[in-house]
Swiss-Prot record:
The lineage of its organism: Eukaryota, Metazoa, Cnidaria, Anthozoa, Hexacorallia. Keywords: Disulfide bond, Signal, Toxin. One of its GO terms (molecular function) is toxin activity. This is N.vectensis toxin 7. Residues 1-21 form the signal peptide. The keyword Glycosyltransferase does not apply. Expressed in ectodermal gland cells. Probable toxin. Disulfide bonds join C44-C77, C46-C69, C62-C78. Transmembrane segments: none annotated.
Amino acid sequence: MASFFKIAVICLVMLVVCSNARVIDVDDDYLMDFAASKRGGQTCYCRGGSGPTGGFWGGQNCPAGMTSCRKNILGNCCQKSKEGTDCDI
C-alpha cells in the first residue's frame, strides 16, 4: 500500500510539473535570437541598401510586389526585380 501511495504522489507531481510550462523559467528572448542567428534570419538583406519590409516566419507570405529573401525559415520581404529576386544572402 505504501508503494502505491509513493507512485501516486510521483505521478501527481509529474502531472503538475508537465502541465505548467512556466515551472522552469526559460529566457525566450535569448532563445529566439539564438535560433534566428542560426537559421540565417539576421544575415538576409535586400539589395541596393534598401531596408526590408520586416521579417516573417515560414508560413507567412510577403506583400504583393515583394519576394521573400530567406534562408531556411526566417527572412525578409524585398522588392521584386526583373531577375525575380532582390536579395543579398
